[in-house]
Regions:
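Rossmann-fold cofactor-recognition segment
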Residues: 78-80
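Short, solvent-exposed amphipathic alpha-helices that sit
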Residues: 22, 55-67, 90-92
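Charged docking surfaces used in two-component/phosphorelay signaling
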Residues: 82-90
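Short helix-capping segments at alpha-helix termini
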Residues: 70-76
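Gly/Ser-rich helix-loop-strand patches that form or flank binding pockets
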Residues: 25, 94-144
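Short, well-ordered secondary-structure micro-motifs
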Residues: 19, 46-48, 92-93, 116-117, ...
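Small/aliphatic-rich secondary-structure junction motif
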Residues: 1-54, 139-141, 151-160
Length: 160
């Protein structure tokens, strides 16, 4: 399976930041198109009601771009998307619209009652996504649960 495009949805959490960095490196290594997406969700946790929509889109694009170096921005020329709605639904819709080959997203790894009450956007996406989904945990959580940080080999060796 050739990976020609990678979608990285974010909620600007620590786990999403880790996924964004991982997805960016994969896109660079594989020569894939990169799509960066933000969905504020129904609660609008990061949504500023004071922003007119155009300014909010610009602010979102700038924030997404801030995770990439100038060289990465020039090489990848990412596409940016801002969607409002239920995050899992919007991620899946956008992946279908753009014919994405891989979704790379963060997961909080909740379990038990927190998972039952809060649900999991990542789990919802995995269940209905039109392509494979790679879940990435935040580095601190991964290190805490496994005793040490694990260096991930370059994506080309994994996929190619």
């Amino acid at each position: 399976m050739a990976v020609r495009s990678v979608l990285v949805p974010t909620d600007f959490s620590e786990t999403s930041d880790a996924a964004l960095h991982y997805g960016t490196e994969m896109a660079l290594t594989l020569g894939a198109r990169l799509y960066l997406m933000y969905v504020p969700g129904k609660t609008g946790e990061h949504f500023e009601a004071n922003y007119p929509l155009g300014q909010f889109e610009t602010a979102t694009r700038e924030r997404l771009s801030s995770f990439l170096t100038k060289e990465q921005l020039e090489r990848l020329r990412p596409e940016y998307a801002l969607r409002v709605g239920a995050p899992a639904d919007e991620i899946v819709r956008y992946a279908e619209l753009c014919d994405v080959d891989l979704i790379v997203m963060g997961t909080h790894g909740r379990s038990g009652i927190a998972h039952v009450l809060l649900g999991s956007v990542a789990e919802q996406v995995v269940r209905v996504a039109p392509c494979p989904v790679l879940l990435v945990r935040a580095p601190k959580r991964a290190a805490a649960t496994q005793g040490a940080a694990v260096k991930v080999p370059p994506a080309k060796r994994i996929l190619g």
